C-alpha cells in the first residue's frame, strides 16, 4: 500500500514470500533505493517520498516506545530477547500501519540490532535537511523531530560503539566496524 518502497524481492507465490519475508520493507534496502533515486535529479520527488515514509516509520508509536524503553533501561537490548527490543529495521509491506512482519499472529522473531541501517538513515536524513530537500514543513509533521532526538539518545544509551549487532550482512552478533562507522 505504500508505493514508496523497494521490496527486497517479489514472488509469484504467497507461500514463498511468507517463508522468506523478503517481501517486507527493509530500512537499509529502502535507503539504498533512496540513494539511487536521489542521484538522478529526475527522481527527486520519488526519492523524497521514500525518505519521508521511512521517517514516518521511524516515528510510529511502536518505534518511539522501543527507543524510550531502551533510553530508560539499556539492558533491554541484552541477549537474544534484546533483538526484538531494538528499533526495528523492517515491516510488513502489506500493513497500512507499518506493523511487524507476523508469523502465526505474532511478530516474527528477528535480530533487529542493525545499527548500520540506523546510522545510514540518520546520515541520509541529515544530508536531506542540509541540502533543503527536507524542509521545516516536513520535519514538523507528527513525531518526526521527536523520533530523531530519541534515536540519537537511543544509540547513545545503547553504547553503539561497543554494541554487538548483526550488521549489514545480518550475520551473528558481533562488534561491526561498519555499524559503528555509520552511526558516527
Descriptions of predicted regions:
Residues 1-184:
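Acidic, mature catalytic/reactive cores of soluble proteins
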